[in-house]
């Protein structure tokens, strides 16, 4: 009882501190509502220099949170894209900030029109555990480029990374500019209730609904980067080694704990055995052993490991054939496993997998594969393997997904010049590059008239002049 009271008191204290922090950031924004390009570039360069200097410490912190996280995967999937994204924005922010001239109709002349891009104010970012660095720095980059103040809520599942990032960012930003927030679920709930000018959430669809509901109380606009079951479609003619190798990379990275990882693969029925053989050969080439392999990342915690084992048990009990590619390794290293003969009533086909399990589903014709995808919630990503241009266009035009890779996996997320975001149940809104700048800016339309006022002819009292001139010229 005493422990419960102490916990509640601590929790309330953290929430009070959170609200006070938000108030300080709002006051700081009001004191400097339009930072110039020089200031924004300085922020971005300081962030880039910090990440570059502290990359080893970040690698070690993320490794501690996972108990075993491939250092190369952290470099490839977190540090490198973060650095590139910052560099990309810093080079272009001055151009992005320039007011955009717009056309004015003849009936409103003389006049001018433009769009001015203004910082929103205080931006909230809620970060998941699977890529704690990239999914905090990516939104931070866009928000800073747009001139905002930023509060970042780190996941309670990555405490080492959260503490380190809080310490590092405090070295280069005052707390009323950028602040990292730590805490358990109750702090996260309170965070989503703050009256941010924009809130970006990355995580599960089920949690995203709660975040959006909380934000709606303040009419806070949200960007939701969710997930779903992202399909890979293998065509009838693509060289199977090409498809198997690239799908295996997408499923192996971070042990499949990636929101855009291939969730299941659709393969022509006559080529299923070929796919299984090639996939097994590729994965075992990637990872000659599982235990103590520094290249193979662990499942983040026991709860997630238990969830994935539960999927395997459920599928086995309902008639699926399991093809594990290794024996289970130490430190929560769960082997890649192919699942054949799956059915829609299995949990592995009902929920986002978020791990190294890959159902293989046969199809007869391309239209059957597209129908299978379209009967399900719209995914965050879709992958198609086939070099026929007409078939590629058919897949693009006849399916909906947040993004697409043709003949590869994951890499669309690393492109700074294309937007990243979901559609429907997989999310809403976009960020990365210019789209990130736009998401975190208010595009303010500005109409300007000179002293001469031709608009007097449409002022009341209405008479013959408006009938003869205005209506005759413009109502047609």
UniProtKB/Swiss-Prot annotation:
SUPFAM superfamilies in UniProt: ALDH-like
Active-site residues annotated for this sequence: 225, 259
Top-level taxon in the UniProt lineage: Bacteria
Assembly and oligomerization: Homodimer.
Gene Ontology MF: a single term: aldehyde dehydrogenase (NAD+) activity
Similarity comment: family membership: Belongs to the aldehyde dehydrogenase family.
Cellular component GO terms, alphabetical: cytoplasm
GO biological process: aldehyde metabolic process
Catalysed reaction, written as an equation: (E)-coniferaldehyde + NADP(+) + H2O = (E)-ferulate + NADPH + 2 H(+); (E)-coniferaldehyde + NAD(+) + H2O = (E)-ferulate + NADH + 2 H(+)
PROSITE patterns noted in UniProt: ALDEHYDE_DEHYDR_GLU
Protein's name in the database: Probable coniferyl aldehyde dehydrogenase
Record-linked PANTHER family: ALDEHYDE DEHYDROGENASE, ALDEHYDE DEHYDROGENASE ALDX-RELATED
Keywords: NAD, Oxidoreductase
Disulfide topology: none
Name of the gene encoding the protein in the UniProt record: calB
EC number(s) recorded for this UniProt protein: 1.2.1.68
Pfam families per the UniProt record, alphabetical: Aldedh
Phylogenetic classification of the source organism: Bacteria, Pseudomonadati, Pseudomonadota, Gammaproteobacteria, Pseudomonadales
């Amino acid at each position: 009882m005493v422990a419960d009271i102490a916990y509640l008191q601590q929790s309330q204290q953290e929430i009070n501190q959170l609200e006070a922090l938000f108030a300080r950031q709002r006051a700081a924004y009001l004191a400097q509502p339009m930072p110039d390009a020089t200031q924004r570039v300085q922020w971005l360069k300081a962030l880039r220099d910090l990440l570059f200097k502290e990359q080893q410490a970040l690698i070690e912190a993320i490794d501690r949170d996972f108990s075993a996280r491939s250092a190369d995967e952290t470099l490839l999937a977190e540090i490198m894209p973060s650095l590139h994204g910052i560099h990309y924005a810093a080079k272009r922010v001055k151009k992005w900030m320039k007011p955009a001239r717009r056309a004015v109709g003849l009936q409103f002349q003389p006049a001018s029109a433009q769009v001015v891009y203004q910082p929103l104010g205080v931006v909230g970012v809620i970060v998941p555990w699977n890529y704690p660095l990239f999914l905090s720095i990516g939104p931070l980059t866009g928000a800073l480029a747009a001139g905002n103040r930023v509060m970042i809520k780190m996941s309670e599942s990555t405490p080492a990374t959260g503490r380190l990032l809080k310490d590092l960012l405090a070295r280069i930003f005052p707390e009323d500019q950028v602040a990292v927030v730590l805490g358990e679920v109750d702090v996260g709930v309170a965070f989503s209730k703050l009256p941010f000018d924009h809130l970006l959430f990355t995580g599960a669809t089920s949690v995203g609904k709660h975040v959006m509901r909380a934000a709606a109380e303040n009419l806070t606009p949200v960007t939701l980067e969710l997930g779903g079951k992202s399909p890979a479609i293998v065509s009838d003619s693509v060289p199977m080694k090409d498809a198997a190798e690239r799908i295996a990379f997408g499923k192996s990275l971070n042990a499949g704990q990636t929101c855009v990882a291939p969730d299941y693969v659709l393969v022509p029925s006559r080529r299923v055995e070929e796919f299984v053989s090639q996939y097994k050969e590729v994965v075992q080439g990637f990872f000659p052993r599982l235990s103590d392999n520094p290249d193979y990342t662990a499942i983040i915690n026991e709860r997630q490991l238990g969830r994935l084992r539960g999927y395997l048990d459920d599928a086995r009990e309902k008639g699926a054939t399991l093809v594990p590619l290794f024996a289970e390794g130490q430190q929560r290293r769960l082997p890649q496993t192919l699942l054949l003969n799956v059915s829609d009533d299995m949990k592995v086909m009902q929920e986002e997998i978020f791990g190294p399990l890959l159902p293989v589903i046969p199809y007869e014709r391309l239209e059957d594969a597209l129908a299978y995808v379209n009967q399900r919630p719209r995914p965050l990503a879709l992958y198609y393997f086939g070099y026929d241009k007409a078939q590629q266009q058919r897949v693009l035009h006849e399916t909906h997904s947040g993004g697409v890779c043709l003949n590869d996996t994951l890499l669309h997320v690393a492109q700074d010049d294309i937007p990243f975001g979901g559609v429907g149940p997989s999310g809403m809104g976009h960020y990365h590059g210019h789209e990130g700048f736009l998401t975190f800016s208010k595009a303010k339309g500005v109409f300007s008239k000179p002293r001469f006022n031709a608009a007097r002819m449409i002022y009341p009292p209405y008479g013959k002049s408006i009938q003869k001139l205005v209506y005759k010229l413009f109502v047609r």
